[in-house]
Design a protein with these regions (language model features):
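Conserved short loop/turn motifs at secondary-structure junctions
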Residues: 28-33, 184-188, 219-220
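Conserved, charged catalytic cores of large soluble enzymes
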Residues: 62-68
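Short beta->alpha junction loops
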Residues: 1-6
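Active-site phosphate-binding strand-loop segment of PLP-dependent enzymes
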Residues: 7-55
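Active-site-proximal loop/turn and secondary-structure-junction residues that shape catalytic pockets
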Residues: 31, 60-62, 88, 215, ...
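Active-site C-terminal subdomain of aminotransferase-like
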Residues: 23, 50, 55, 71-183, ...
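Non-catalytic terminal extensions of PLP-dependent enzymes
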Residues: 152-154, 162-164, 170-173, 188-282
Length: 282
């Protein structure tokens, strides 16, 4: 999706992209860059018609959307699988991602089994060959400790403040919000002020926002640790609109801007590959 598709995926376009080689269709609830939820119900109907599995990436919003009847997802929407990250808004240790299957008939497709290994019969139910038991125990303990009521309350507050931030920002001249986010992430840009100038202003007030590309924008994730301070975001943006335009760019914004303008993305990939070589060199 792009900034001009506030209504989310163009369903008719999806129909034409499904072929005999399509193994799965993936939808987001919500997507990471803009916090927008795909039209999962309609996508599910198409997947049913074409007999293609539908996976929903709910890693970012799984612990938020499921407590709001207007945006929650369900396997009844012709969904085959759902991914959720408890280590995000479940607040458990990193590395506790979940893959939920509609039924046991589908699940064996993720198994790895070899019967003729010299070390014996080897089987794993997931990509990691083994899992640390303490990770599973800690995840379970924290979920039980926080409790269902905590997650319901957290979800309600985050959705409420995300909608408030959206309604406040769209009133600010020259500042544009991408789509109409209603979960926990919001992305914005300016049709007048360079992104670098906006970033500098936020950093002066100890806010570090993530830089997105295609299109270039900033996004913020609303959490229990910052929702009480979201008025600062609108205050900073209001202050920016009183400034003169400054066109200098520096830091990450320069890198992202350069990468977006390079037509051959293979070059970008090679540069990043060299960077990873340097950072992992012994």
């Amino acid at each position: 999706i792009n900034e001009n598709q506030a209504t989310l995926p163009v369903i008719n376009d999806l129909k034409y992209k499904i072929t005999s080689k399509t193994c799965v269709v993936i939808a987001s609830s919500p997507c990471y860059p803009y916090g927008l939820i795909d039209n999962i119900t309609d996508i599910g109907l198409i997947c049913k018609d074409y007999d293609v599995p539908l996976h929903v990436d709910a890693c970012l919003g799984g612990f938020i959307t499921q407590f709001d009847e207007s945006i929650k997802i369900s396997f009844t929407d012709n969904i085959s699988s759902i991914s959720v990250d408890p280590h995000k808004f479940g607040y458990v240790p990193k590395g506790s991602s979940l893959l939920l299957w509609k039924n046991n008939k589908i699940r064996p497709n993720q198994y790895f089994i070899t019967e003729d290994w010299t070390g014996g019969i080897y089987a794993s139910c997931s990509l990691p060959g083994s899992r640390v038991g303490s990770q599973i125990a800690t995840t379970w303990a924290i979920l039980i400790y926080n409790g269902l009521d905590y997650y319901k309350c957290m979800s309600k507050l985050i959705i409420k403040n995300t909608k408030k931030l959206y309604n406040d920002i769209i009133k600010i001249p020259t500042i544009k919000v991408i789509g109409k986010p209603n979960v926990n992430v919001l992305a914005f840009y300016s049709d007048k002020y360079p992104l670098g100038q906006i970033i500098d202003e936020f950093q002066k007030h100890n806010w570090n926002l993530n830089i997105m590309q295609n299109p270039m924008c900033l996004h913020i994730c609303i959490t229990p640790y910052n929702y009480e301070k979201i008025n600062e975001i609108t205050d900073i943006l209001q202050n920016i609109t009183t400034q003169e335009v400054r066109n200098e760019t520096k830091g990450l914004i320069s890198i992202y801007g350069m990468a977006e303008k390079i037509p051959n993305k293979k070059i970008v990939r090679e540069i990043v590959e060299k960077y990873l070589d340097l950072t992992t060199n012994l």
